[in-house]
Amino acid sequence: VKTVYIESELAADLDRVWHFMQLPATFLYLCRGLFGVPALRRRSEPLQAGERGTGWLMAFHALPAYRHTIEVLSVDDATHTIRTHEYGGRIRSWNHTLRAEAVGPGRCRYSDTIEIDAGWFTDLVALGAAGIFRYRHRRWHKLIRIQATRQTPNTRAAFPPR
């Protein structure tokens, strides 16, 4: 088992980041360009503990990579933490903890911790995960910058096409 950890300080208040963390549209936006999950495309409801789903993970939005399963273990409003258990393809276990915490007025720290078990492929999968999550954190900063110029109650309109 390998653990990948990455954190970023975002120029947004905790409530805003926590709201976005719970939306499947945020996940799709953060991963856009690397992969997509067609099963989530029309989903607008926030994540809820106990949910479980399986769908194709599409590399570069075109190539079916493998069927990925996610189970949402917890969505904790008090600690601003989401925990999932995921697996699929070569990945036996991908335990993901997403967390946000206030660090000052209009600023918060967002972190991802991923515990990965992919058997003999664990080191390679962990290396890939580190790259994916660095990309996702860059996209978080971009999303926050875009959101700073918009005030929209429409969740779909909150996510730009690129």
Positions of predicted regions on the chain:
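Hydrophobic pocket/interface hotspot
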Residues: 16-21, 27, 72, 82-84, ...
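Hydrophobic/aromatic beta-strand elements that line small-molecule binding cavities or substrate pockets
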Residues: 6-8, 67-74, 86-87, 95-102
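Short strand-connecting beta-turns/loops that link adjacent beta-strands
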Residues: 13, 77-78, 103-107
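Beta-strand/loop substructures that line and gate deep hydrophobic ligand-binding cavities in soluble
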Residues: 83-131
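Hydrophobic ligand-binding cavity/cleft-lining segments
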Residues: 1-49
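Hydrophobic residues positioned within well-ordered beta-strands of beta-sheet architectures
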Residues: 4-6, 55-56, 68, 82, ...
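A conserved amphipathic terminal alpha-helix motif
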Residues: 114-162
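Glycine-rich portal/gate segments that line the openings of hydrophobic small-molecule binding cavities
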Residues: 28-29, 38-87, 159
